[in-house]
Amino acid sequence: ETADAVLILGEDVTHTAPRVALGLRQAVRNKAHELAKQAGLAVWQDAAVRNLAQDQRSPMIIVSAMETRLDDIASQTVSLAPQDIALFGHAVARAIAGQPSDDEAVNEAAAALKNAQRPLVVSGSSMLHSAIVDSAAAVADALTDLLQADSAQDDSSMLSFCLPECNSLGLALLSEEQETLSRLLARTDEIAVLVILENNLSRRLSPDQIDKLTSSGTKIIALELLDNELLASCDLVLSAASFAESEGTLVSSEGRAQRYYPVFPVAHERLASWQWLRDLAAASGHTELAELQHFDQITAACGASNELFKPLASVSPDHNFRSHGQKIPRQTHRASGRTAINADVSVHEPLRKLDPETPLSFSMEGLNRDQPASLTPFYWSPGWNSNQSLQKFQSEVNGPLRGGPVGQRLLEPQATGSRQSSEFTPLQVMDEGKWQLVPMHRVHGSDELSVRTAEVAELAGEAFVAIGPELAAKLEVVDGDGLKINVEAAGLDSIETSLSVKILTRLAPNCVAYSAGYSSTLALQPGALALLSKDSNWPRATPQLIASDRNSYANETNNRPSQDTDIDKGRDKDRDRDKGEPRHV
């Protein structure tokens, strides 16, 4: 939010990192804050500051394959294919270093970044194109060199990468070798037993690759919470606890290791994944792993195995920590009425579950005071709304938390390290009559878990293929029509599917976008070249409602007593008259 110039390369952060998108919306207002300072206005006088600035904003350059929700605040938008986005980034890096480009858009972007005191470069992996990430790093390198050369400036450039999943960076740091699924499949005959740890490979491998894996003779053990297509072919499936029922450590995109704890006790006979792995090790005769009894021991072992993970032991206190001799309650004082929840079944309060792995208790008993910030289960204070009570846990209003920072940085910002070359040659060659597929992420739908809940899946909508107005006119299709996509790749079976059409106002030339992560688009590969044609047999979808009370009608009818009052009967007549016409909200 402190940046005064932003360059976004190939990332639609509204859908891949919504919190970053909110921060960027705040960042473009820094120009208004600067004008307010010159005029003697306090920043908190929001109406006056907005009136002074009008439409003046800090520069934000968005270079993407398709339109984004941040286009309305961008000073410049450029629509390019993924390989051209990488070229654009490298050209900006050279322009910052003093080699102007023939492309005026490149020079404008470079000038905006050079004139900034706190420039920010944002990129990510959503396009699945490593050259885009490299180009963002090259721009950051060029900005660092520029700022260091000017000794009068005490400013720094910033670089932010958006990651696909919550622990993508942590898993990358754990991997000593750059092992890939393709390399794994190439040597399945060398693997006696394959353990799949909470990873739905049916979303990451094609059906042919799944068949190759399951028919290789390798024994497959899966630790999984949710059912998927691969589990039926596994030799052993162990039911793992969900993230809300187990403990662990995540590494954020900032490079900060943060501990998470169970929200509620694990149900049924499931165990946390680390406990299943420990039991498997004991069954296979691995005595060293079998002796691990607590998660803290695993954390300590990780810290001892690698210098990079040494801070893990200090991320959070161990399970023996007590606040003034007591565990820290997960529940607020408002949970005092919990005994009445099941009073219709039994007036006896059930015995609360114990938690031997954390300093927290599954109850409201304990002391929520003076503990480290990483062990604060909730923010609540008498007389304050929950979000406003945060100040009670800070050393000062809008200041740091009183219990110290949450987590430990494994990766610290540095001005030195490996550098990225500003040279890049694209390998993609376009064929006449074909369009390049680029993934288009949705905040609801692209994530694996977002469609597991019916209400969220309804927000996700159906899978789609997005095209520009000119291509839509050429193919004679409109929003909601069907479009056939045919992809032929060397050495692989051809892929043919039909998707609903979505027309975008801004899309890179020779590109079509598809909704990434949807079950019907998993077979499509980013960068593949596709043939497009209208699907005349496509059934158009019915108009979608924002909300409907149809379900509430059904629930109310099912729960109604058998003897209706006169008012109920009159209401039933009204509903019979309006049957099938849900009310819009």
Question: Which sequence ranges carry the predicted segments?
Answer:
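Internal, active-site/partner-interface "lid" segment
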Residues: 103, 274, 288-306
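Structural signal for hydrophobic packing residues in well-ordered secondary-structure cores
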Residues: 10, 28-35, 92-96, 100, ...
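Glycine-rich oxoanion-binding loops at beta->alpha junctions
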Residues: 1
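Flexible, glycine/charged-enriched surface loops at secondary-structure junctions
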Residues: 35-39, 149-159, 288-295
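A cross-kingdom feature strongest in bacterial/archaeal respiratory oxidoreductases
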Residues: 8, 16, 20-69, 136, ...
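A glycine-rich, hydrophobic/aromatic-adjacent loop/helix-cap motif
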Residues: 119-187
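Long, well-ordered, tryptophan-enriched scaffold segments
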Residues: 5, 14-124, 128-129
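Short, charged, low-complexity patches
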Residues: 85, 89, 269-273, 277
